[in-house]
Amino acid sequence: MGDKMPDSSQLVIGADLAGQPIAQAMRLANRHGLVAGATGTGKTVTLQRLAEAFSDAGVAVFAADIKGDLCGLGAAGNPQGKVAERIAGMPWLNYKPQAYPVTLWDIHGESGHPLRTTLSEMGPLLIGALLELTDSQQSALYAAFKVADREGLLLLDLKDLKALLNHLRDNPQLLGEDAALMTTGSSQALLRRLATLEQQGAEALFGEPALQLEDILQPAADGRGRIHLLDASRLVHEAPKVYATFLLWLLAELFEQLPERGDADKPLLALFFDEAHLLFADTPKALQERLEQVVRLIRSKGVGVYFVTQSPGDLPDDVLAQLGLRVQHGLRAFTAKEQKSLRAVADGFRPNPAFDALSVLTELGIGEALVGTLADKGTPEMVQRVLVAPPQSRIGPLTDTERTMLIAGSPFKGRYDKPVDRESAYEVLMGRKGLAPEAEPGKPAAEEPSFTDKAGEFLGTAAGQALKSAMRQAANQLGRQLVRGLMGSLLGGSKRR
């Protein structure tokens, strides 16, 4: 960038060895990116720095908070010691300690707003990956979804799917030509997998009010992009498949719902996928191929995807080849295999005659990185050794009190916090049997609203969100079948409206 002062049109990463800013044009931020490095080298702080830059430019951010300290974005920084020294060496940074507009989410609803989707919205391909089904079990699941679509049975939560499977076991004639797919063994296996999923606490992910993507894209009152943080500190250890599947669903929904934007001065949304290797671990080939397609195509929808992991080798080559911005923190290499991997990382950068990237990789200190940006024409710049700019927010977690206050002051307070259990497959099928559905603990049935309620107020409530979801479900069924699976638009299905 030379002596030019960086602004919000630039995604500033830090300074080179001469103290000059290293940045990439914000309009190229939809070309995706990578933040990699060994544990303890500074990846989280780099992620924090990038999230701030996006927010300042008015770009929404969704990121997973794996260690629990990324939430420091919600409090102003207090730089001291080496951090203060680094800031002093970057006078062009215009550093100003400040908190950022953060919304906290938690699938379990403990450390943030509950985060939910429905089985119908997730689709059988992703659910099959979540349950780690065999091919025959996956076929049985598709057959069940097909019946649900034909019978008009909404699949919102796990009890809906269990009720449907039990119903098909007792009434196999409903499967028609697909009856051979739903054997006793496959049905029992599906029910066992669902029980295991419940034991992992995954049932909290499915239900209503479901997450509305327009809420993710909604800017803060001051025009900055809102930063949405998913507290995954518990989830990623207890149920890594649930964590990965939710992120895949989010990516698929964005691809399906967002219109084409073409070239723009900045993205709509930046997604940060921490522990990115989990997205590809034991992933069925069909799902991985679709994921690679979506990563390639979603940039035209204004979404930049940033993978955060220890080594670039954690990602498939087809995905790695699509990543424009690369921030590589230090790596350690002791074995011959690690040395080979290290060389591959160095070879992934455009060489800089000023230094040997391979040698530098093992010398980088905390908060240092090799950075490869894109030039204005979209071609790779020479790799630079960079001191990452400190974030303006707090480096470290919020206190419990601060977290509670942040949730209480959230613009989404009351919209997602209380679950709504409206009539769906479980209630319909229990009704056909003449049985009264059992109320789930903590899941009250939705009350019918008064006609005197204002429409705007109603649609902001949990019940209103459920109504919007119901309308969306009905539109989906008119436009496409539930068996579309993941990214149905890639397979010729209709997009959501």
Language-model features: locations:
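Residues at the beta-strand->loop junction immediately N-terminal to the Walker
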Residues: 25, 36, 48
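The conserved Walker
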Residues: 35, 39, 283, 312
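Conserved P-loop NTPase motor module
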Residues: 4-5, 10, 18, 114-120, ...
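Conserved lysine of the Walker
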Residues: 43
